[in-house]
Regions:
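Beta-sheet repeat architectures centered on beta-propellers
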Residues: 1-19, 23-45, 183-198, 204-457
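Beta-propeller and closely related beta-pinwheel folds
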Residues: 11, 17-33, 71-243, 280-290
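Hydrophobic or amphipathic alpha-helical targeting/insertion segments
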Residues: 33-81
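Hydrophobic beta-strand segments that make up the repeating blades of beta-propeller
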Residues: 50-52, 155, 199, 306-307
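Structural motif
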Residues: 53-56, 106, 259-261
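Generic beta-strand hydrophobic packing signal
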Residues: 59-61, 75-80, 94, 148, ...
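A short loop-to-beta-strand structural motif that recurs across blades of beta-propeller domains
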Residues: 60-62, 162, 206, 314
Length: 457
């Protein structure tokens, strides 16, 4: 299995510790540890350098670096220390921007951002932990900082009720903070991500974007979540009770945001997924994933990996497998796709449905269930029972990995159509496809409905 190394060690030598000395050090206490923010500086080392700030705002930023070669941790040299930004300033947020470490959100200085000296190369003895050297400084804003993000040439500063950008951080004569808007703020810094060339974040009135324009240095605000405004409204109304986390799955062009209370159950944890399509964002909800922290990136082979962690300290491979495993226990995944109510262009005509054909894109063997409801689920008219669809197998390619005769299905399409006869009639109808099992994932591509008009009133 995987090997874990605790990195918050105390009294590490300035020149670094070998593996034996480092693992033998006492633990560096992280008082009131809460959700953390990570900043990674690639630098000149093989493994980069990492800075960790804590939203509990009870500790200084933690700095960690590892050097050396070889596949075993025992061949490495380890560096660890706490960063003194300014006295007892304990920032909550951190980011690397244009050769600087930038931090903000300290409880004692909520309106102030601090930036380190300029990071150029090792010959200048540049140090991520130095907030007093050449090029370092601080700026006080008019609003409380809730998040920071490097975006193109600017540092975007998200505040409670406004958004700013920091320009020319490396030019002392022209460094400036310019307002983007003083009417829109960010509800939680952990919602900020970059996807499709834009920044997205959770605001009081929805998921908003900050996008670059054709004009150099110009940005514009947009809104992309009108379809799920009721969900966003409920989330925004209670945002202070939730732990927010978010990430971007690049291979799927998806923005994912999760929210749950500090003591809530995994089963009750929720989230939203925004997928970029040619027609803009398409949205869905998640249930049963407790992600108090989540991250996505590429491994050494260029393969995207995503992990999340829950309140009990379990780390999970995200978006993999056919079932959830909260605390190591296999649990069904509940999936549901709901259509609007269709009147087929004439709400006054009663329609008798004969059958429907549904296009799926399965990732393995699946057998979902279909539910048809008439006239906005009117309880005063007969509603048909649920239909268990025919089992759908993943199509196989001859010679493919894991393909065996008498087991794999050959000659099938990647997006099979399933025909299901249905009963009932109404002026409108809706369809729900759902499953509660440990079978493979699937996408619903579309419907074909065959019906006959059966009267008008």
């Amino acid at each position: 299995g995987d090997s874990w190394l605790q990195i918050n060690k105390d009294s590490v030598a300035s020149g670094g510790d070998n593996y034996s000395t480092f693992t033998g050090r006492s633990t560096l206490a992280r008082t009131s540890q809460d959700q953390a923010t990570f900043a990674i500086y690639e630098g000149l080392t093989d493994y980069g350098e990492v800075i960790i700030t804590d939203r509990g705002s009870g500790v200084k930023p933690l700095y960690f670096k590892m050097t050396g070669t070889g596949s075993a941790l025992s061949t490495r040299t380890f560096f660890c220390e706490e960063i003194t930004v300014s006295g007892t300033v304990y920032p909550k947020f951190c980011v690397i921007h244009d050769k600087h470490l930038v931090v903000a959100g300290a409880a004692t200085a909520p309106n102030t951002i601090y930036y380190s000296n300029t990071l150029l190369d090792s010959s200048n003895n540049d140090d991520l932990t130095d907030f007093t050297g050449t090029g370092s400084g601080s700026i006080v804003l008019d609003d409380q900082v809730v998040g920071i993000k490097s975006f193109r040439d600017d540092l975007i500063i998200f505040c409670s009720n406004s958004i700013y950008k920091l320009e020319n951080i490396n030019v002392s004569a022209s460094i400036a903070v310019v307002p983007i808007t003083k009417n829109v703020g960010c509800l939680d810094g952990n919602s900020i991500q970059e996807i499709g060339g834009d920044l997205v974040f959770l605001s009081p009135d929805g998921i908003r974007t900050i996008a670059g324009t054709a004009r150099i240095g110009d940005v514009e605000l947009g809104s992309v979540s009108r379809q799920i405004q009721s969900i966003i409204g409920s989330l925004a109304a209670s945002v202070d009770t939730f732990r927010i986390s978010s990430t971007v799955l690049r291979s799927k062009s998806q923005y994912r945001l999760f929210y749950s209370t500090a003591t809530g159950t995994t089963a009750g944890s929720k989230g939203i997924i925004g997928t970029i399509t040619p027609n803009g964002f398409e949205w869905s909800e998640t249930l049963g994933i407790q992600a108090h922290a989540i991250t996505s990136g590429f491994d050494k082979d260029g393969v995207e990996k995503t992990y999340h962690g829950d309140k009990d300290g379990y780390i999970y491979v995200h978006d993999d497998g056919n079932y959830f495993t909260p605390a190591g226990t296999a649990t069904n995944i509940t999936a549901e796709y709901q259509t609007p109510n269709y009147d087929f262009g004439d709400v006054g005509t009663r329609k008798t449905l004969l059958y429907t054909r549904i296009s799926f894109s399965p990732e393995g063997d699946i057998q979902p269930t279909l539910r048809v409801r008439y006239d906005y689920e009117d309880q005063n008219i007969p509603q048909p029972g649920d239909y268990t669809l025919s089992s759908i197998s993943l199509p196989a390619i001859f010679g493919g990995s894991g393909v065996t005769f008498n087991t794999a299905v050959f000659g099938a399409t990647n997006d099979p159509m399933v025909r299901q006869a249905v009963q009932g009639s109404g002026n409108t109808c809706s369809f729900r496809i759902f499953s509660d099992d440990q079978k493979a994932s699937y996408a619903v591509n579309g419907f074909y409905v065959d019906y006959v008009p059966s009267g008008r009133r």
